[in-house]
Amino acid sequence: MPRRARQAPGGLVYHVLNRANGKLRLFKKPEDFIAFEQVLKEACERIPMRVLDWCLMPNHWHLVLWPERDGDLTAFMRWMTLTHTQRWKHAHAAVGQGHLYQGRFKSFPIEQDSHLLAVLRYVERNPVRSKLVSGAEQWRWGSCHVRQEKAHPMRGVLSGWPMPRPANWLRTVNSVGREEDEARIQVALERNQPLGDEAWVRRMAVKLDLEHTLRSRGRQVGWRKVVTKAGKIR
């Protein structure tokens, strides 16, 4: 059965994730993280993209992107993923050794309200949740750290958010959030399902041909059961 064509109109904000194939580690040393950040920067120069957030983890990464034009998200991700794959394989003497990524990137649109703030917090909190650091700003390979360093070379990649950043944002990121918020994000990650209030989600599902993402899968009904399966995504 052919896979569905991805629809990603401009003006919406998207959470984007991709994961290394099998047990590969994408980022083994600082140079690997820096190389990916360079590709991200070059992608923004080729295809204008508002980058709201990112976090690079040892075997996967998260981006929060806000494209202006229809088709930009797909073009941006295609160039970035292909370029990173080519450079990674060259740097690790792995040319011709199979796929670097599990497949095409996962993504879901986010309503630009408290749901977006929840996703931004989720992304920045990733290394804390995985016990890599005690504070999100300590993780060098994410936008939370970059914002704290005015002279950071990646600071120019960051764009403003659609809404004001809360004054106590860093404290919010580093505090334990609501289980239900994180569970809903896990479901959206697992299913590529729009994230927002019920009316917005249904409207986006129809508009973007994502109605199949709202249907329960077999006996997995409700976010508590789905998140059990999706819990390793982080």
For the regions a protein language model found, what residue spans apply to each?
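Short Pro-Cys-Gly-centered "Cys-loop" motif that presents a nucleophilic cysteine in a tight turn
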Residues: M1-M57, W66-R234
